[in-house]
Every structure is written in C-alpha cells, then in structure tokens.
C-alpha cells in the first residue's frame, strides 16, 4: 500500500492555525489572522507532494503524524504545553464476503488507540483520532455481520509511562463465522509513540491471525488476506 498524501500548503496553514489557537488561546474565535504570518513550503517529490504517477493513500496516517510533528515543534518553543506522541493513526479494518444465504456483507470499521499524555494529565484510553467519532456497539456488529467479538478491552500499561502516562491502546478480537476477505490499513507497526521530558515511549500496534487449524500469523500493518 502507498503512504503518500497530497497536501495543499493552505491546508497545512489551516492545521497549524487551529493548533496555535487550541494550544495558546482556546477562548478566541477561529479566524484567519495567522495566515499571513506563516510560510509553508512542501518540496515536490516528497511524501506530502508526490509526483504523478505516485499512488495516493494513507491520508489519515499522514494527518496524524503531522499533528504529532506540529505538537513537538511548537512544544519546543512552549515547554509548558509540550505533549508526547499518541497512537497517531486511524486503523481501518475491512471484512467482506458472502454469508450462508448468499448475501453480500462488507464491514468497514475504524479503530481507536491511546491519546498522548499532556501537561494537564494522563492521556485518555481507547480514543478515536477524530474527536466526534464513537464506537459501533459490539451487539450491532454481531447482529448484522457473520462474526463474534471475543475481545474488546484496553491494553493495560500500553501507554508510555511517565508523570502523566500516555493513554492505553485498545485490544479488539474478532471470530469470523463465514469465509471472507479481510484488509488492514494501519500504522505504528515499526515506530513507538515517543515520550517527552523523561517520559517513556508507548507500545506499538500488532495484528495476529489465528486460523481454525490453530496456526498463528503475525500480520503487517497494511495487508489483504
């Protein structure tokens, strides 16, 4: 899977301005007064400005890493507001096929993770990258798709330890009841979310498939099976 994300410089300015306002003066109204104060240059041929025919994908992964980088850069100039890195991802899971009645099914689910520790306190556990997202109840999934949810819990001590620990990640286990195909589009498989001011890194993500015959396979972060 590709990891390129074509990002417009003006959009990057908007991200940066929203970050400034939320970080330094969250009581004021959002406005465009910061636009003329910021100069953004994204070099051609980079992961944020790929050149055709480079494939585009992973928008959510790159967006979250940009937020981490902005937080780290701005935090160096304002140490009292410095945050660690979070799970910085929007894990996508897909399961599709035909059920026993020959009806097509297709599940598309977005996963949650640990939000970074911050000066105000510990990071929240099992949270979406997007503030307004909520989880789909397990009972709904089991009623409408040929699967069972066997695990749905936070991963104890998976957030980076420190004065204000990082939020714990989420463990989600599926039992598939019908043959089908699964796709995973995730990140944080190789790199740990970093800590700051002496705080330690958090845990990476992993994916394990256990087949009906008992064989086990550790899967990469982006794959189809």
Label each PLM-derived region with a short phrase.
Residues 1-225:
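Glycine/proline-enriched, intrinsically flexible loops and inter-domain linkers
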């Amino acid at each position: 899977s590709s990891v390129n994300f074509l990002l417009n410089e003006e959009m990057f300015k908007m991200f940066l301005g929203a970050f400034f306002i939320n970080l330094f003066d969250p009581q004021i109204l959002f406005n465009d007064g910061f636009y003329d104060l910021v100069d953004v240059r994204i070099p051609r041929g980079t992961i944020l400005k790929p050149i055709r025919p480079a494939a585009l994908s992973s928008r959510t992964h790159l967006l979250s890493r940009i937020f981490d980088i902005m937080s780290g850069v701005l935090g160096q100039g304002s140490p009292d507001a410095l945050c660690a890195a979070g799970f910085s991802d929007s894990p996508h899971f897909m399961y599709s096929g035909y059920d026993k009645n020959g009806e097509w099914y297709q599940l598309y689910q977005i996963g949650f993770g640990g939000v970074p520790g911050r000066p105000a306190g510990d990071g929240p556990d099992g949270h979406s990258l997007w503030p307004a997202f909520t989880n789909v109840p397990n009972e709904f999934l089991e009623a409408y798709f040929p699967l069972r949810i066997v695990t749905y819990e936070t991963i104890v001590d998976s957030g980076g330890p420190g004065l204000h620990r990082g939020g714990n990640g989420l463990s989600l286990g599926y039992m598939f009841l019908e043959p089908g195909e699964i796709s995973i589009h995730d990140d944080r498989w190789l790199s740990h979310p970093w800590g700051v001011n002496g705080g330690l890194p958090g845990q990476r993500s992993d994916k394990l498939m256990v087949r009906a015959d008992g064989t086990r396979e550790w899967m990469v972060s982006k794959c189809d099976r």
